């Protein structure tokens, strides 16, 4: 009995323009997985589309069909074994031919395919595998033209994209280029076996006291013949040590065992405990010979989405292992427009950055793709909760029968693939499709509960989100929460702040409110909000080739910002808040200050609301990352270089954070006058699970002199409420008695150490003289590749930002420094002889 074997088909490929019939048309493919844009670049047929205006020069690629071909020899096959040709992903309209015969046709990028080629490979010698990838943009237009009755309402990209099960951002989005890829985007291989494990999954029940857990493990076997003589040997282990072992027989090609685990190690999100991962493995055996084995990492945990009526409306927050978790985090878009170029190492670096930024949840956005296994593995290992959208975004999707069938297969395949990951705590039906329904005035009668009726309306996609997808999740991953859409709340208008989740875009988009009042604009769970900022100069220098173009309003910089009204909106927030500048380096910095302040005001206020009976259950900023070097809402750019907002968010999400703010005074309205008085508030937010005692100080420091304008306030033995908010004090600033502009500087000590700071500034910054700050940055120690810098100032300093240099990490940046409160920053990665990091602050 031969064991399972596999043979990757990753090399030896060539490709060509499908319309070019000349023998010289074939070009070598360095490695598969790949897409045509990558392979054209490798053959010097296409310039890097991420530089300058090269995206425009790459548009011709979108309109072409491409053919890939390889020649291989039949592997050794034992008697009774089958040969399977396995494709993990084909992008998108693919016709697969083996030795000239069509063996597969696919029109869904998100599906894997398995084709039995045993008979086709009976002949010895060379075999030719050829894949024709038809032009997805053309096919999309043809499909749209066939369905004239459907209302193709959408935001972003060509509405025809909704006819195709392909990453929707490939049609261009308001943060990315229009690069429609084609190719073998995931692994292809030959598998040879008489029997193999086709699936391994678990169902976990954790006792309410967390003292015991029951792990039921299941395996499914793929075999041409009877499996009565096979057995499945299961092993559960933790950190390489055996926890339990059991052997089971197969019935209808499925085996099941149940393990009772005492004192289980639980999987926790980062900041709440160790994300303990058990390993479940199964070996398929016959006559004491191992035929095939599979193992997966799983977590023992519970995850609930708490939606209960309360005085604010209806709650929306996550409870993990019985602990309420404020989900501060980010939305995730694909990390590249050319998906096969993203390595497992790059995925892990992104998730490591999230954890370094104290973020606990990532939302996989519905216009991209179901991510690579390595993405979810990193989230499992590092304790990051995953909000997983299904791949529908910003549109009214059609529902003809063939498309629904393909969507159901897609959902089944991906939920099966992902269901063992403890990081995934919610599946969500779509991104903003209910907002499209509202915008276009499509029919949505929430009280009509008959799915067949929904298909007859002009919003038939409701059937996908409220019938098809939840049925798949219930069948395959019954303990994972399903939510129909983002945003969505009980069928109410999606901007309703009392229920469900909310995308709050009235800062930047919409009514373009002042970012200083962001916290008043939120809902029960703020799953999108953002502010644009330029990336660092090193990133700009990558995609802006000509020195003459390195100014804020250059055509190439404009071209690399795809957002609607981008320049005008950036300018609005700049001129309202800061003294403007025209040199590029300062302009870049100023946009980053605005983004950092916006994120701080939002997160700080919403985290405070967590303590008000879970008024706000979480905040997921738009967006963590970029898919190309660009100007966008990302807080970390394409090259993993954090913008100042990354650090601002990290400080607000500390286990214990202090907040201080004065009431907002709108200086931009007609006949605005300086306020005579301003109320202020001081509070502490804690995610710790036990009460803590600390000392808190509030100082009132002149912006102009750095001196106290009134006596500090000091409170000892302050009891800090666990997993909530502790309101410390309220007061009033009398601007007649204290006319000098001054900051409110708060410090919190716990166990004798400063654990948190916050500084509230008079707004807007443009009215302040921030020159001559007396700032000093001194190296106080050095050990190996680690340096410690002490930062002091004679007058309050706003947003001290360190240079982001590849391979170098700073423990903090975008900092406010006040007199009498020196702060230490650790720099990791600088070698002896390296130039010190440059820095910039407001008013410098």
UniProtKB/Swiss-Prot annotation:
Taxonomic lineage of the native organism: Eukaryota, Fungi, Dikarya, Ascomycota, Pezizomycotina
Pfam families: Glyco_hydro_2, Glyco_hydro_2_N2, Mannosidase_ig
Organism: Aspergillus flavus (strain ATCC 200026 / FGSC A1120 / IAM 13836 / NRRL 3357 / JCM 12722 / SRRC 167)
Gene3D superfamilies assigned to the protein according to its UniProt record, in alphabetical order: Galactose-binding domain-like, Glycosidases, Immunoglobulins
Other information: In contrast to clade A beta-mannosidases, which are likely secreted, clade B proteins appear to be intracellular.
Protein name: Beta-mannosidase B
Keywords of this entry: Carbohydrate metabolism, Glycoprotein, Glycosidase, Hydrolase, Polysaccharide degradation
Regions annotated as coiled coil: none
The keyword tRNA processing appears for this protein: no
Glycosylated residues (UniProt): 723
Signal peptide region: none
InterPro entries: Beta-gal/glucu_dom_sf, Beta-mannosidase-like_N2, Beta-mannosidase_GH2, Galactose-bd-like_sf, Glyco_hydro_2_Ig-like, Glycoside_hydrolase_SF, Ig-like_fold, Mannosidase_ig
Matches recorded under SUPFAM superfamilies: (Trans)glycosidases, beta-Galactosidase/glucuronidase domain, Galactose-binding domain-like
Its job: Exoglycosidase that cleaves the single beta-linked mannose residue from the non-reducing end of beta-mannosidic oligosaccharides of various complexity and length. Prefers mannobiose over mannotriose and has no activity against polymeric mannan. Is also severely restricted by galactosyl substitutions at the +1 subsite.
GO molecular function, one term: beta-mannosidase activity
E.C. number: 3.2.1.25
Swiss-Prot/TrEMBL catalytic activity: Hydrolysis of terminal, non-reducing beta-D-mannose residues in beta-D-mannosides
Active-site residues from the entry: 432
Known pathway: Glycan metabolism; N-glycan degradation
